[in-house]
């Protein structure tokens, strides 16, 4: 049965939930502001959300974990420094050292950004963050579980997104990556032709050394990619996700709904912007629990306009495939609400769903 068929004054109650979401977003933005991963501000927002969830659920717990919040975006600075040095050293005749630095930059980028590994974490200061876990028990024993998720922290400002939106962001990153590939090819050619530690006297590869200098401004620009002193309010990314998960619990409670054998959870993760650290901590701690009981995870992130709303069937820059059964379930839910939600891929970055 659809909720619209079984709940009296359905539209009014949905509107009430929408108003609740807007009120909660405004409250956190005004009273807390930006919420750096693992910061007191992140915890303050979570404490408020936990207090709200206690009204609608049977239990609310905090699960703490350690993280290194600046490690995730630290790869950008490392790549910039390594590539500036690589280009200079190549032109001075130290192609082997240049190659090593290029590979260091490439490995940091792949491990941290494409694979979201905790690769650079030991080199950065440690903090403590937490996940908020609210549970609404079913009627009868737990045979199934559905988790609604949003992340509580907000990101450091990305300067080029602020200045030119997604197009400038992609251009800045793409130009730097092209430069890295060009330098890598030149370094391999130098080693293959016996110029590992000697400069080219002339010819094509000598000219390519000068061509690489064109990318120096690009590498300098990515050093300023992240505004480390400015944490954005994160009303869209991702208070919208948090309050959607909270609104599910409120709606169920307000209407006296308990599913038979299906437990409902709201998991409000910390430190997503630091490389999905909260989601990773939850998945690690609850791994066996999720395998023993059929579990569905629905991650809400940046719920804005209907025109931009989608079901993301691929994540982590397209490298992770989300379960198509859950995607189809969300597709059906959208149809019940009169929305034809397309399947899309997270083309740059990732979400807790990954």
Feature map (PLM): residue ranges:
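Proline/glycine-enriched tight loop/beta-turn segments at coil->beta junctions
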Residues: 138-145
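A non-catalytic alpha/beta surface segment that caps or lines the substrate-entry region
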Residues: 34-137, 159-206
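Histidine-centered divalent metal-coordination motifs
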Residues: 151
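Zn-dependent metallopeptidase/amidohydrolase metal-coordination segment
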Residues: 26, 342-354
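N-terminal hydrophobic or amphipathic helices/low-complexity stretches enriched
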Residues: 1-41, 47-60, 71-75, 136-137, ...
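Generic structural signal for residues in well-ordered beta-strands
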Residues: 60-62, 266, 341-343
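Extracytoplasmic/secreted proteins, especially bacterial periplasmic and envelope-associated proteins
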Residues: 20-23, 27, 44, 48, ...
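Acidic/histidine-rich catalytic neighborhood of metal-dependent amide-processing enzymes
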Residues: 102-133, 141, 154-159, 189-321, ...
